[in-house]
Amino acid sequence: HMTCIVSDDDHGRFYIEDLSSNRVSHTNPPISSEISSGRCLVMVSDDAERTMCTNLGISTEFWTSDLDAEIIKASHYLFLEGYLVASPKGMEVCKKAIEVAKESDTKVSISLSDPNIVNAFKDEIKTLLDMKCDLIFCNEDEALAYAETDDISNAFQIFKEISPNFLITQGSSGCIGFDGKNEFNIPGIKVNAIDSNGAGDMFAGAVLYCITSGSSLEKGAIFGCYAASKVVGNVGPRLIKDEYHKIKHNFF
């Protein structure tokens, strides 16, 4: 289930229709507003890295009333995007969602989203992490920014004090993680990378699929690296539907 808000414009209607066509349930219909739907211009360089120029649009109006508490209560995991802390309303939404999750034993996961978000809104992110998130997703740049260090080993130790479970992705090098007891290092998968846009989302989605199906966090990380390696070989953040079935079939 995806909770978000979009305007009743071409981009917003397309987004909601795309969610529906991919069998992702959602609560809020497009809103009639003078504020446009959020948009993001993604520029991809020859090394497959991407730079984003984002207009949050009506997303800055996302409010606690847009949450569906019953959906959160019925979920195994609540997944929050760190981008939400960029607006005061988004921050309140995150806190309310975590409170609802904690009341119903729904586990909380959060993505730090972007090193610029971490640098600009570290206090806000810390507030959310202090609410005892069960699982943190971040890449190496985000981890270093949050820990205020240039040594990933130091950052790793700091994250062990923050959350019982976390995963730090390292691009083509794979990822490192901690599951509350064990540290692990998952090697990357060699691939001809074209576009890294969507790799982090694919990784997080694959991990959450695994652990909510009963697998360990380490196995989830292995699957996450495998799935992410498939999306970076294509232009754009998503694959066609059939490719997702192939990824699951080939891995499991």
Please provide the spans of the model-predicted regions.
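Conserved phosphate-binding/catalytic loop of the ribokinase/pfkB sugar-kinase fold
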Residues: 27-31, 42-88
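Conserved phosphate-binding/catalytic region of the ribokinase-like
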Residues: 99-103, 123, 148, 152-252
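Conserved beta-alpha-beta core of the PfkB/ribokinase-like small-molecule kinase fold
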Residues: 77-157, 173-175
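Substrate-binding N-lobe of the ribokinase-like
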Residues: 1-39, 56, 250-252
